């Protein structure tokens, strides 16, 4: 019986090792393809301070009353930006929510300025359900727009927007997680991969 458990454990370890190897290979292929442009990367903003809340959610320039990036969130976003640069992944248009945590994530990851828009800003309970639906549709449409030649598009938004736009499979979308889409040319965004922030950093180090 003990030998059976040992054998099962060895098989299980081999399975997980094979999965990890396949995921690494897949990400390597993806980052290589992204050098040519044509992808839309939708990020949930970076890690935030969990003891903060948006106490003035309708005044987007009132940063003092927002949940903002944590020290770790800032550091990881910088590292992801450095990884994109090292990997040769270039962004043309960079769109963010109007909340500071999204704006800063976009700036740190792209290394440049961003266009902040209400279309991908979290509305929550302070806007109407109709407006939340409009924003979800706006995010879906934006993810389906083909980027300029040789460039990728970067979008930084929020969990509710991502969940509303793309469905229940994103219920557990993490802070700093990216969903990489390939627009099909007819306005539809085709999901290619979901990548955690740390995996971009690892890919650049390989």
Regions found by a protein language model. Give the residues of each.
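Bacterial N-terminal signal peptides that target proteins for export
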Residues: 1-9
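Bacterial N-terminal signal peptides
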Residues: 9-16
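Sec/Tat signal peptide C-region and signal peptidase I cleavage site
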Residues: 18-22
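Active-site-proximal alpha-helix that buttresses catalytic centers in soluble enzyme cores
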Residues: 24-127, 133, 169-206
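Generic beta-sheet signal
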Residues: 38-40, 148-157
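Histidine-centered catalytic micro-motifs
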Residues: 43-48, 155-162
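Glycine-rich phosphate-binding loop signature in dinucleotide/nucleotide-binding domains
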Residues: 87-89, 146-150
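A short, acidic, amphipathic alpha-helical segment used as a generic capping/interface helix at domain edges
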Residues: 137-147
